[in-house]
Amino acid sequence: MASVAPYMPEGRRGIHFMQQWFNLSNPAMEDALHDAPPFRDFAGLCGLDDRLPDETTILRFCHVLEQHQLAPQILKTVDDLLQHKGLKLKTGTVVDATLVAAPSSTKNATGERDPETMPSKKGNQWYFGMKTHIGTATDSEPVHTVRGTSGNVNYVAEANSLLHGEETEAWSHAGSQGAGKRPDAKPGVRWNIAMRPGKRKQLDPEDRPIEQLTDELERIKARIRAKVEHPSRVIKPQFGHLNVRYNGLAKNTAQLHTFFTLANLWMAGKHFQGAQAEVRPTCLKAAGKPPLGALTPGRCHEAAAG
């Protein structure tokens, strides 16, 4: 893409995307380029004189994305393209957050915690890591805004930052109660936030017509909010992003922007003919049995073909 071209050759972008699809470390990506011809083809390294990048070169490209804040620009470019193709991204917004686990101090190689990740309680369970906050359009699934924070940041604290500024309706779960009354609330936006579970249990829809309508309204809210779960389903079980890979929120947030860029293309495949080929080109489908355990044909098919 044009935003990346001044900093690195086009092939580096393809290598970076393959890293995310197959959840590969820098050394594993270097090995895959040497051992799997389809990976070299996708990166444009097909000639005999082409020099394959080593793990240090691959790492430098990640640093370039982070330092110049290119990953958010790539996400915006893809969203603009999808919108130009007819996908509605500027209507209402559904916001959500999900926890991504980080190594604890006992499992970390250095024996130290990442100072930018914090513990967070969900239900009766404690987690240690970061939170991924996203905003998606109500009429479609692609993500338009991504924010990365420590695990202890409350959902409502980031709710208004996930709006693109052109919507009049916003939707969220009960954890965002009070979003419309915060100092950073945007004028003209009406928040449709789920009722707290305890209050909803007290409803008596069978004997009270008004509470029956309230219960039905909560069902409608839940159906609208359900779309925001789809992008996380793509990047977690399909792309394998179950734990943070780096130390520091900046590096992990840059990776999240890339993940959701690829997830947007994957999800847009059902709206546009041929969009799946943009996510995983044909050359990767024919990779056969790769040398690495992480690159099984089934995993390759799941990660991009759907």
Located regions from the model:
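Basic, short loop/linker segments at the boundary and entry of helix-turn-helix/winged-helix-like folds
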Residues: 1-17
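Short helix-capping/linker segments at secondary-structure and domain boundaries
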Residues: 21-28, 142, 239-244, 264-277
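Helix-centered, glycine/charged polyanion-binding patches within enzymatic domains
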Residues: 168-169, 174-250, 254, 276, ...
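Acidic, contiguous segments within the catalytic cores of piggyBac-derived transposases
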Residues: 221-222, 255-259, 266, 270, ...
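A short, flexible helix-boundary coil/loop motif
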Residues: 238, 270-306
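A short glycine/serine-rich beta->alpha loop
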Residues: 1-5, 47, 246-250
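Polybasic low-complexity intrinsically disordered regions
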Residues: 8-13, 27, 31-34, 44, ...
